[in-house]
Regions:
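ATP/NTP phosphate-donor binding region
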Residues: 1-65, 106-122, 131-141
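Redox-cofactor binding/interface segments in oxidoreductases and associated redox assembly factors
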Residues: 6, 68, 179
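Short glycine-rich anion-binding loops that position phosphate/pyrophosphate groups of nucleotides
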Residues: 11, 72-74, 97, 183-185
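Short glycine/serine/threonine-rich phosphate/pyrophosphate-binding segments
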Residues: 15-16, 73-78, 186-191
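Short, acidic/small-residue loops that bind anionic groups at enzyme active sites
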Residues: 85-103
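Catalytic core of DAGKc-family lipid kinases
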Residues: 97-175
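ATP/nucleoside-binding phosphotransfer catalytic cores, i.e., glycine-rich phosphate-binding loops
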Residues: 149, 165-168, 217-289
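Gly/Ser/Thr-rich active-site loops/lids in small-molecule metabolic enzymes
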Residues: 170-215
């Protein structure tokens, strides 16, 4: 490990204090660092003039790892680019729950372990998400957490038909559906009543959101399944697809959303060696205090 990209969420890391502290620790340990913004900021946002921001797309060509500073959303945003470049990522939580993050902002000294090789890598399953309209692929993305198909802002329910390997698994009316990875089981899926699943297992979770059918429950499918979702014939309105909380994509009647296990896997850097159950217990206890 020689070259590290630091990607702070400028709306979370006030004054960039956390990323600058981390940069000093890493440089003192002999590592080369670059600070890059993970996304474009608002035009009215004042970036400090004394920090030199490098271009993320260029730095990804040469980096050995990416450290994300923010909440899980920041990590999810960076996971796609890092994974496509086969670069592992490490999360430093400056958010609320932060299930994916390895460190809290008070644990920055542990970053020195990157220089000495005292870390391990976790492989996390990702989802491949496509939408076909007639014969054309009109949308494609990858997800570390989930793909959510929802009714949007309208008050009426959305009617969905869900199949696994071409066989109908459920048809229901409700607020929508979440197809998630085990990593995503502690995110939106959990809020919709889905189970907590160990993140290193290989499953696909199918979780209805506020289903009006009492028999529509979360399904834990094999990672070998292909899940297809369409608006049911009884549907009156469009639906919207969002991957890892990203920008919503409109689904029309006849569109087919397909979700399956991706060939790509996100590599998460582990420094602490903590049990997943310790993480779950600590996060929920901290959030409820």
């Amino acid at each position: 490990m020689k070259r590290v990209i630091l990607t702070p969420n400028p709306y979370r890391d006030k004054g960039f204090r956390t990323v600058l502290a981390a940069q000093k620790i890493l440089q003192d340990a002999g590592l080369e660092t670059r600070i890059c913004l993970p996304f474009d900021v608002d035009k009215n946002f004042d970036l400090p003039k004394d920090i030199r921001f490098a271009r993320l797309d260029r730095e990804l060509q040469h980096a050995d790892c990416v450290i994300c500073f923010g909440g899980d959303g920041t990590i999810l945003h960076m996971a796609k680019a890092a994974t496509r470049h086969r670069i592992p990522i490490l999360g430093v939580n400056i958010g609320t729950m932060g299930f994916i993050a390895e460190l809290e902002s008070s644990e920055l000294e542990d970053l020195r372990k990157l220089a000495t090789g005292e870390f391990s890598l976790d492989s996390r399953l990702m989802l491949d998400v496509t939408v076909r309209r007639d014969r054309d692929v009109i949308f494609h993305d990858i997800a570390l957490n989930d793909a959510a198909i929802t009714k949007g802002a309208v008050a009426r329910i959305v009617h969905l038909n869900v199949c696994c390997d071409g066989v109908q698994a459920m048809e229901f009316g409700g607020d929508g559906l979440i197809v998630s990875t085990p990593t995503g089981s502690t995110g939106y899926s959990l809020s919709a009543g889905g189970p907590i699943v160990e993140p290193d297992t290989r499953n696909i979770l199918i979780t209805p959101i506020c289903a009006h059918n009492v028999d529509s429950r979360c399904i834990i499918a094999s990672d070998k399944r292909t899940v297809t979702v369409q608006l049911a014939s009884s549907a009156r309105r469009n639906a919207f697809l969002s991957v890892d909380g990203g920008k919503a994509f409109k689904l029309n009647m006849g569109d087919v959303a397909t979700v399956c296990c991706s060939r790509l896997e996100t590599k998460l850097i582990r420094l602490k060696g903590r049990s997943f159950y310790d993480v779950v217990n600590n996060k929920f206890r901290k959030h409820n205090d």
